[in-house]
Amino acid sequence: MRIDQSIINEIKDKTDILDLVSEYVKLEKRGRNYIGLCPFHDEKTPSFTVSEDKQICHCFGCKKGGNVFQFTQEIKDISFVEAVKELGDRVNVAVDIEATQSNSNVQIASDDLQMIEMHELIQEFYYYALTKTVEGEQALTYLQERGFTDALIKERGIGFAPDSSHFCHDFLQKKGYDIELAYEAGLLSRNEENFSYYDRFRNRIMFPLKNAQGRIVGYSGRTYTGQEPKYLNSPETPIFQKRKLLYNLDKARKSIRKLDEIVLLEGFMDVIKSDTAGLKNVVATMGTQLSDEHITFIRKLTSNITLMFDGDFAGSEATLKTGQNLLQQGLNVFVIQLPSGMDPDEYIGKYGNDAFTAFVKNDKKSFAHYKVSILKDEIAHNDLSYERYLKELSHDISLMKSSILQQKALNDVAPFFNVSPEQLANEIQFNQAPANYYPEDEYGGYIEPEPIGMAQFDNLSRQEKAERAFLKHLMRDKDTFLNYYESVDKDNFTNQHFKYVFEVLHDFYAENDQYNISDAVQYVNSNELRETLISLEQYNLNDEPYENEIDDYVNVINEKGQETIESLNHKLREATRIGDVELQKYYLQQIVAKNKERM
């Protein structure tokens, strides 16, 4: 079977490879390209690159990649024709296949695709009923009085379901769709006594609900006459699952990636108004708590999430619960606190679009700052709560991945407890550590190293200095750790504290992607080991290793009996100082030989 080349080109032009790959891979911008862990093979260091300019992807490890069709073929393990059809469905391009064999070879639409087609066909009918019929005039006036322009109504595909039990039913039946499938799609309801079917949505303003690819998979029908419920949503179906759907994600995804932030609101109406006001990276759940599936998808797009829930007690409680969960999941969490009793729609209606966008830009707090401001009265007047929340907030701050954001949170939170940021940092470092971490001895017990004072780090041997510098570079970058971890025998460390830190780093990087001292100290429960970690944190060393610098440290630690260029240069200078020509000649030959080895 063959597909017309113009169709293939249209699908390729309408499919952004960055959006496509982002559904499977968490990508980070590196220069002009994006990089992430390859979805086709296991790896710890990202080697999968996506070029937005060239619209291609490539893995430097397993060599797989290509354009949007080749990526889809690989990720779904399907043929080229199937990949074209799938991507065509994604961007609403019909794929006409010229069969070289009988028509039976042409793949018909799946039930899921037929369900989506039903939703998209009836949307056109609903839109017509709202904008072109007498019956829809009252609903249209209701929308216009609430700031919905004709352009916004068209952009969002808003429609009207007439007050008829068979409007949708008859329309779909005339189009040749199976009525039972329309019921399973959530467009119809069923009388369980006589098994007759009737419209689920009647006399309601219809808001289409789209999946991440922009396909309509459900509806939310809003009353405009005061009937209950206020909003009637599609039921759970094979194509509409609330735990997987974030309203407006299809429109907001590019802005989320560009701004490296997603803003979560309570309802889709707030999203529509916020988006119209100029806030383009907004989404909302469909009346449910943020699910694990939601969080997984968000983490593929960004590590920064801002909560902007209603300014009432329920909104505050939801913010605390949701924010705590997101923080535990390793995301950077921020909060925009709306004035009491207001939601985004009401704020925009009262103050206008410009005031709203300025408020959002200038009134963003870390979750820890928001939480302590909510609890401030209890902290101030209840000593038991003071201790409890001091520990809670210390733990919350320790979960933050950015050391810069941690320091800002320390500065913001400390005054609520009448302590200095340094004292709060000490609470994090010394009282939040979990179970003991010591290496095991031959009997299975734990050995605590002999005490060593911070001052003793100023009197290290040449070998210990190499160990310290080596660890410092490993602490700065996970990729460096992964590249060099197996190059060193831990038993070759002469400083036992450094040896234990080396082992701590192994455990730390097994669970974390980026090193920070607040997280690392939780992997030890020894004052001496914590002191060593803090000393290494404070140790000043060049940010980027010089050429072969780390290799030199590895050689020293492993005691390979090979002089480093640094030590040979030092000995050459000493031989020159004392005037020993033979030694000068010897060390110069050694330096030349070592430089040749590196070439």
Swiss-Prot record:
Task: Write out the catalysed reaction.
Answer: ssDNA + n NTP = ssDNA/pppN(pN)n-1 hybrid + (n-1) diphosphate
Q: Does the keyword Magnesium apply?
A: yes
Keyword line: DNA replication, DNA-binding, DNA-directed RNA polymerase, Magnesium, Metal-binding, Nucleotidyltransferase, Primosome, Transcription, Transferase, Zinc, Zinc-finger
**Segments forming a coiled coil:** none
Q: Report residues binding Mg(2+) 1.
A: E266, D310
Superkingdom, natural source: Bacteria
Residue positions annotated to bind Mg(2+) 2 are D310, D312
Question: Which GO terms of the molecular function aspect are on file?
Answer: ATP binding; DNA binding; DNA helicase activity; DNA-directed RNA polymerase activity; zinc ion binding
Q: Where are the zinc fingers (CHC2-type)?
A: 38-62
Record function comment:
RNA polymerase that catalyzes the synthesis of short RNA molecules used as primers for DNA polymerase during DNA replication.
What is the name listed in the Swiss-Prot or TrEMBL entry for this protein? Answer: DNA primase
